[in-house]
A protein has these predicted regions:
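OB-fold and OB-like single-stranded nucleic-acid-recognition modules
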Residues: 1-134
Length: 134
């Protein structure tokens, strides 16, 4: 089963309607500066991109994400958002690609590079891997 089956879609018809795929598989590098657990069970991670990847940011990343790219490993935490529970996207699935000890470390992250149409910023979502480098 594809990771897309576990992406929350909310008011959109499908996850692919909410997240416009720009590149289905992209690996980037940068430093994790912040992470928080979201109501839909995902991590919301802010990545300070290495200079060669800064062109991946758009105006919403600059204004709403302090100039960081968002990474969203899915179904990694307790889900308490009602529509996510009703969709059942995390039922029987847990993604363990991120731990908080990676905050402050340089990593390579791989996933689908998308435009989040709900928020307007770009992100990696779903994320397939986050590994420390150097």
């Amino acid at each position: 089963m594809s990771l897309w089956a576990h992406v929350y879609h909310g008011r959109f018809l499908s996850a692919e309607d909410r997240l416009q795929v720009i590149n289905p598989c992209l690996t980037i590098t940068g430093t994790i500066v912040h992470a928080r657990s979201e109501a839909d069970g995902d991590w919301h991670i802010q990545l300070d991109l290495d200079s060669e990847y800064r062109s991946l940011l758009n105006q919403a990343n600059l204004e709403k994400q302090q100039g960081y790219l968002v990474l969203e490993p899915m179904c990694s935490n307790r889900v308490w958002q009602r529509d996510t529970i009703e969709e059942g996207v995390c039922d029987g699935f847990s993604q363990n690609t991120f731990t908080t000890d990676l905050i402050g470390h340089r990593v390579a992250a791989t996933g689908a590079y998308v435009l989040d149409k709900q928020h307007g910023w770009t992100e990696l979502h779903p994320v397939t891997s986050i590994v420390p480098i150097e």
